[in-house]
Amino acid sequence: MRIVLITQKEPFYLAENISYLLKKLPKESKIVAAVIANPSPFGNKESFLNKAIRTLNIFGLKFFIFYSLKYILNFFRKSKNVETILKKNNVSIIKLEKSINHKSSIEKIKSYSPDLLVSLQGNEIFKKPIIELAPKGCINLHTALLPEYRGLMPTFWVLKNDEKFTGVSVFFVDEGIDSGPIIVQEKVKITNQTQRELIIETKQIGMNLILKAIQKINSNDFTLITNDDSKKTYFSFPRKSDVEEFIIKGKRFF
Protein backbone atom coordinates (compact mmCIF):
# COMPACT_ATOMS: atom_id res chain seq x y z
CA MET A 1 0.00 0.00 0.00
CA ARG A 2 1.43 3.34 -1.12
CA ILE A 3 1.17 6.13 1.46
CA VAL A 4 1.70 9.87 1.15
CA LEU A 5 2.38 11.61 4.46
CA ILE A 6 1.12 15.15 5.10
CA THR A 7 2.98 16.80 7.94
CA GLN A 8 4.91 19.90 9.04
CA LYS A 9 8.37 21.02 10.22
CA GLU A 10 7.37 20.81 13.88
CA PRO A 11 10.66 21.03 15.83
CA PHE A 12 9.81 19.40 19.17
CA TYR A 13 8.32 15.89 18.93
CA LEU A 14 7.37 15.05 15.36
CA ALA A 15 10.68 13.93 13.82
CA GLU A 16 11.17 11.17 16.41
CA ASN A 17 7.54 10.08 15.97
CA ILE A 18 7.96 9.84 12.20
CA SER A 19 11.25 7.96 12.58
CA TYR A 20 9.48 5.40 14.79
CA LEU A 21 6.61 5.12 12.30
CA LEU A 22 8.98 4.44 9.41
CA LYS A 23 10.86 1.76 11.36
CA LYS A 24 7.68 -0.07 12.40
CA LEU A 25 5.70 0.29 9.17
CA PRO A 26 4.50 -3.13 7.94
CA LYS A 27 6.33 -4.49 4.89
CA GLU A 28 3.25 -4.37 2.70
CA SER A 29 3.01 -0.58 3.20
CA LYS A 30 5.43 2.15 2.16
CA ILE A 31 5.54 5.92 2.63
CA VAL A 32 6.49 6.96 -0.90
CA ALA A 33 6.33 10.74 -0.46
CA ALA A 34 5.62 13.49 2.04
CA VAL A 35 4.25 17.01 2.02
CA ILE A 36 5.96 19.14 4.68
CA ALA A 37 4.32 22.44 5.64
CA ASN A 38 6.05 25.22 7.55
CA PRO A 39 5.95 24.80 11.35
CA SER A 40 2.81 25.58 13.30
CA PRO A 41 3.53 23.73 16.57
CA PHE A 42 0.90 25.34 18.80
CA GLY A 43 -2.09 25.37 16.49
CA ASN A 44 -2.97 28.40 14.39
CA LYS A 45 -1.10 28.92 11.14
CA GLU A 46 0.46 32.41 11.25
CA SER A 47 3.80 34.19 10.83
CA PHE A 48 6.69 33.12 13.04
CA LEU A 49 6.93 36.56 14.68
CA ASN A 50 3.20 36.74 15.44
CA LYS A 51 3.29 33.22 16.82
CA ALA A 52 6.24 34.10 19.09
CA ILE A 53 4.60 37.29 20.39
CA ARG A 54 1.29 35.57 21.03
CA THR A 55 2.98 32.63 22.78
CA LEU A 56 4.86 35.02 25.07
CA ASN A 57 1.75 37.07 25.87
CA ILE A 58 -0.48 34.07 26.61
CA PHE A 59 1.85 31.46 28.13
CA GLY A 60 4.35 33.72 29.86
CA LEU A 61 8.12 34.18 29.90
CA LYS A 62 9.10 30.79 31.42
CA PHE A 63 7.13 28.83 28.79
CA PHE A 64 8.45 31.10 26.03
CA ILE A 65 12.11 30.68 27.07
CA PHE A 66 11.78 26.89 27.48
CA TYR A 67 10.33 26.32 24.01
CA SER A 68 12.49 29.00 22.35
CA LEU A 69 15.63 27.24 23.60
CA LYS A 70 14.22 23.88 22.49
CA TYR A 71 13.47 25.36 19.07
CA ILE A 72 17.00 26.79 18.67
CA LEU A 73 18.78 23.65 19.93
CA ASN A 74 16.63 21.32 17.85
CA PHE A 75 17.30 23.39 14.72
CA PHE A 76 20.85 21.97 14.75
CA ARG A 77 19.88 18.38 15.61
CA LYS A 78 19.31 16.09 12.64
CA SER A 79 17.23 13.74 14.80
CA LYS A 80 14.71 16.58 15.26
CA ASN A 81 14.49 17.55 11.58
CA VAL A 82 11.43 16.07 9.87
CA GLU A 83 12.77 16.50 6.33
CA THR A 84 16.15 14.95 7.22
CA ILE A 85 14.46 11.89 8.75
CA LEU A 86 12.25 11.42 5.68
CA LYS A 87 15.09 11.81 3.18
CA LYS A 88 17.24 9.38 5.19
CA ASN A 89 14.46 6.83 4.69
CA ASN A 90 14.23 7.50 0.93
CA VAL A 91 10.90 9.31 1.15
CA SER A 92 10.40 11.83 -1.67
CA ILE A 93 9.55 15.38 -0.56
CA ILE A 94 6.65 17.02 -2.40
CA LYS A 95 7.16 20.78 -2.69
CA LEU A 96 3.87 22.68 -2.84
CA GLU A 97 3.68 26.30 -3.99
CA LYS A 98 0.00 26.69 -3.10
CA SER A 99 -2.45 25.47 -0.44
CA ILE A 100 -2.78 21.71 -0.21
CA ASN A 101 -6.35 22.11 -1.50
CA HIS A 102 -5.21 23.91 -4.67
CA LYS A 103 -5.58 22.00 -7.93
CA SER A 104 -1.82 22.12 -8.63
CA SER A 105 -1.06 20.63 -5.20
CA ILE A 106 -3.59 17.86 -5.68
CA GLU A 107 -2.04 16.97 -9.05
CA LYS A 108 1.45 16.77 -7.51
CA ILE A 109 0.26 14.44 -4.76
CA LYS A 110 -1.78 12.38 -7.22
CA SER A 111 1.35 11.79 -9.35
CA TYR A 112 2.66 9.49 -6.57
CA SER A 113 -0.44 7.25 -6.90
CA PRO A 114 -1.14 7.00 -3.15
CA ASP A 115 -3.53 4.37 -1.84
CA LEU A 116 -3.79 6.22 1.48
CA LEU A 117 -3.02 9.69 2.83
CA VAL A 118 -1.80 9.99 6.43
CA SER A 119 -1.93 13.40 8.10
CA LEU A 120 0.36 14.01 11.09
CA GLN A 121 -0.12 17.56 12.32
CA GLY A 122 -1.18 18.79 8.90
CA ASN A 123 -2.02 22.44 9.46
CA GLU A 124 -4.76 23.02 6.89
CA ILE A 125 -8.40 21.96 6.84
CA PHE A 126 -8.72 19.51 3.96
CA LYS A 127 -11.43 19.94 1.33
CA LYS A 128 -13.23 17.18 -0.54
CA PRO A 129 -10.81 16.80 -3.52
CA ILE A 130 -7.81 16.06 -1.27
CA ILE A 131 -9.87 13.89 1.10
CA GLU A 132 -11.04 11.74 -1.82
CA LEU A 133 -7.71 11.67 -3.69
CA ALA A 134 -6.52 8.28 -2.39
CA PRO A 135 -8.74 5.19 -2.89
CA LYS A 136 -8.46 4.14 0.77
CA GLY A 137 -9.02 7.65 2.10
CA CYS A 138 -7.16 10.03 4.37
CA ILE A 139 -6.53 9.40 8.07
CA ASN A 140 -5.49 11.73 10.87
CA LEU A 141 -4.28 11.46 14.47
CA HIS A 142 -5.81 13.43 17.34
CA THR A 143 -4.48 13.19 20.89
CA ALA A 144 -7.87 13.13 22.60
CA LEU A 145 -10.72 10.71 23.11
CA LEU A 146 -12.99 11.88 20.29
CA PRO A 147 -15.67 13.17 20.02
CA GLU A 148 -14.56 15.07 23.13
CA TYR A 149 -11.80 17.68 22.95
CA ARG A 150 -11.87 18.35 19.25
CA GLY A 151 -9.71 21.28 18.17
CA LEU A 152 -6.40 22.67 19.41
CA MET A 153 -4.04 21.65 22.23
CA PRO A 154 -6.18 18.88 23.80
CA THR A 155 -3.42 17.96 26.28
CA PHE A 156 -3.62 21.47 27.75
CA TRP A 157 -7.39 21.42 28.03
CA VAL A 158 -7.76 17.97 29.62
CA LEU A 159 -5.27 18.94 32.33
CA LYS A 160 -6.87 22.33 32.92
CA ASN A 161 -10.31 20.71 33.19
CA ASP A 162 -9.10 18.12 35.74
CA GLU A 163 -9.98 15.13 33.56
CA LYS A 164 -9.07 11.69 34.92
CA PHE A 165 -8.66 10.21 31.44
CA THR A 166 -7.86 11.39 27.95
CA GLY A 167 -7.13 9.33 24.86
CA VAL A 168 -5.80 9.04 21.34
CA SER A 169 -7.91 8.63 18.20
CA VAL A 170 -7.13 7.81 14.57
CA PHE A 171 -9.97 8.69 12.22
CA PHE A 172 -10.89 9.14 8.58
CA VAL A 173 -10.73 12.81 7.66
CA ASP A 174 -13.89 14.56 6.51
CA GLU A 175 -14.49 18.26 5.81
CA GLY A 176 -15.07 19.07 9.48
CA ILE A 177 -12.58 19.51 12.33
CA ASP A 178 -11.71 16.18 14.00
CA SER A 179 -15.19 14.97 13.06
CA GLY A 180 -14.64 11.93 10.83
CA PRO A 181 -15.43 8.30 11.74
CA ILE A 182 -12.93 6.71 14.13
CA ILE A 183 -10.87 3.67 13.12
CA VAL A 184 -8.96 3.00 16.36
CA GLN A 185 -8.92 4.66 19.76
CA GLU A 186 -7.15 4.18 23.10
CA LYS A 187 -7.96 5.57 26.54
CA VAL A 188 -5.10 7.13 28.55
CA LYS A 189 -5.09 7.64 32.32
CA ILE A 190 -4.12 11.06 33.61
CA THR A 191 -2.12 11.01 36.84
CA ASN A 192 0.32 13.80 37.68
CA GLN A 193 1.85 14.25 34.23
CA THR A 194 3.05 17.61 33.02
CA GLN A 195 1.61 18.75 29.71
CA ARG A 196 4.90 17.92 27.99
CA GLU A 197 4.90 14.40 29.46
CA LEU A 198 1.31 13.90 28.34
CA ILE A 199 2.14 15.13 24.84
CA ILE A 200 5.04 12.67 24.57
CA GLU A 201 2.94 9.79 25.94
CA THR A 202 -0.08 10.38 23.71
CA LYS A 203 2.01 10.94 20.59
CA GLN A 204 3.86 7.65 21.14
CA ILE A 205 0.55 5.83 21.61
CA GLY A 206 -0.64 7.68 18.51
CA MET A 207 2.16 6.26 16.36
CA ASN A 208 1.21 2.73 17.39
CA LEU A 209 -2.44 3.47 16.62
CA ILE A 210 -1.51 4.87 13.20
CA LEU A 211 0.36 1.62 12.49
CA LYS A 212 -2.65 -0.38 13.67
CA ALA A 213 -5.00 1.69 11.50
CA ILE A 214 -2.77 1.22 8.44
CA GLN A 215 -2.82 -2.57 8.93
CA LYS A 216 -6.60 -2.59 9.35
CA ILE A 217 -7.17 -0.41 6.28
CA ASN A 218 -4.79 -2.46 4.15
CA SER A 219 -6.61 -5.68 5.05
CA ASN A 220 -10.03 -3.96 4.96
CA ASP A 221 -10.66 -5.34 8.44
CA PHE A 222 -12.08 -2.59 10.62
CA THR A 223 -15.32 -1.49 12.22
CA LEU A 224 -15.78 2.27 12.42
CA ILE A 225 -16.59 3.96 15.72
CA THR A 226 -19.11 6.80 15.48
CA ASN A 227 -17.61 10.24 16.12
CA ASP A 228 -20.88 11.47 17.61
CA ASP A 229 -21.51 15.19 17.03
CA SER A 230 -24.09 15.25 19.82
CA LYS A 231 -21.33 14.37 22.33
CA LYS A 232 -18.61 16.63 20.94
CA THR A 233 -16.69 19.29 22.83
CA TYR A 234 -14.47 21.75 20.99
CA PHE A 235 -11.59 23.86 22.25
CA SER A 236 -9.57 26.53 20.47
CA PHE A 237 -6.28 28.24 21.33
CA PRO A 238 -6.09 29.09 25.06
CA ARG A 239 -6.51 32.63 26.35
CA LYS A 240 -4.22 34.17 28.94
CA SER A 241 -6.93 33.64 31.58
CA ASP A 242 -7.02 29.91 30.73
CA VAL A 243 -3.26 29.65 31.27
CA GLU A 244 -3.51 31.54 34.56
CA GLU A 245 -6.21 29.11 35.75
CA PHE A 246 -4.07 26.15 34.60
CA ILE A 247 -1.17 27.39 36.77
CA ILE A 248 -3.37 28.29 39.77
CA LYS A 249 -4.66 24.70 39.75
CA GLY A 250 -1.08 23.48 40.13
CA LYS A 251 -0.80 22.11 36.60
CA ARG A 252 2.62 22.16 34.95
CA PHE A 253 3.72 22.60 31.35
CA PHE A 254 7.07 20.84 31.86
Task: List the predicted regions and their residue ranges.
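One-carbon transfer enzymes
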Residues: 1-254
